[in-house]
Amino acid sequence: MSAIIELKKVTFNYHKDQEKPTLDGVSFHVKQGEWLSIIGHNGSGKSTTIRLIDGLLEPESGSIIVDGDLLTITNVWEIRHKIGMVFQNPDNQFVGATVEDDVAFGLENKGIAHEDIKERVNHALELVGMQNFKEKEPARLSGGQKQRVAIAGAVAMKPKIIILDEATSMLDPKGRLELIKTIKNIRDDYQLTVISITHDLDEVALSDRVLVMKDGQVESTSTPEQLFARGDELLQLGLDIPFTTSVVQMLQEEGYPIDYGYLTEKELENQLCQLISKM
C-alpha cells in the first residue's frame, strides 16, 4: 500500500535562538487507509508535526509530501482540502448556530450546491449518530456529542485524511471508547487515513501502527502489541501500562507459563481459562 503522507528529514524551530530544535530531522510515512497513533510526552513534537502536515506551520528544512504532492506555500490550501482536523476542544471549532449549520459551514465556503450540502450534512450526522440533534445549539451538547459533531464536520468535507489532536482527552472513559469506535467504523467504511495524537490506550490499541516521539525526534515505530510489550518503559513514554499487561507480568513473576506481550481482555481471559484447566 502506498504512502499518502511522507516526512523526510523535517526540522522546525519556533524561535531562532532555541538550544534544541522543536523537530530534529523527523522522517516517517503514513500508508493510505492506515491508522497511525502518535504518542510522547508534552513537548516531544507531536502537535508541531501535525500542524506541519496541515500546512499551519512551514518547516525550516526537509520536505512533506501529501497524497503525492510536495507541500508548498502555493498548494497549501489544496492540500488542506484533503485533510480534516479535529482538536481537543470542539468549542473552538464551532461557528454555526445549530448543529446542522455548523456541519454545513465548510461546505458552503467551498461553494457546493445547496442540495449536495444537505445530503452531505445528513449523511455525516448519520455516520456519527447525531442526526436527531440537527436543530440543537452546539453549546447545549455534551462533550462527547460535541466531538461527534466536530467529526461530522470534518467527514462532510470528504477528506482523504483525518487528524485527531487529542480529540478524546476531555471525555469520560465511556464517551471516549464510543467515539473511538465511531471513528474506526468510519475509517473502515471509507478507507480514510487516520492520524491520532493520544495518550489513550484504547485508541492506541485500535491503531495499525504507533509512532513514539521524544525530544523532537522519532523514538520508534511499532505495532500496538510491540509497544505494549515494552512494559514499564511505557510510563517513560507518557502512557499507562495496560491492565492486561500488568496481569501477565504478575503471573509470570509468580512462575505461571503464560504468553508474554500485550493481550486484549478476551485473549487474557482465554489464556487464564487454559491455565486453570491444566492445574
From Swiss-Prot:
Extract one GO cellular component term from the record.
ATP-binding cassette (ABC) transporter complex
Stretches assigned to the ABC transporter domain: 5-240
Q: Where is the signal peptide?
A: none
Binding sites annotated in the UniProt record for ATP: 40-47
Entry EC no(s): 7.-.-.-
Keyword Lipid biosynthesis assigned: no
SUPFAM superfamilies, A to Z: P-loop containing nucleoside triphosphate hydrolases (SSF52540)
Pfam families referenced in this protein's UniProt entry, alphabetically? ABC_tran
Please give the NCBIfam families that the UniProt record associates with this protein. ECF_ATPase_1, PRK13635.1, PRK13648.1
Q: What does this protein do?
A: ATP-binding (A) component of a common energy-coupling factor (ECF) ABC-transporter complex. Unlike classic ABC transporters this ECF transporter provides the energy necessary to transport a number of different substrates.
Note the subunit structure. Forms a stable energy-coupling factor (ECF) transporter complex composed of 2 membrane-embedded substrate-binding proteins (S component), 2 ATP-binding proteins (A component) and 2 transmembrane proteins (T component).
Describe the family membership recorded for this protein in Swiss-Prot or TrEMBL: Belongs to the ABC transporter superfamily. Energy-coupling factor EcfA family.
Q: What is this protein called?
A: Energy-coupling factor transporter ATP-binding protein EcfA1
Q: Could you tell me which species this protein originates from?
A: Streptococcus pyogenes serotype M5 (strain Manfredo)
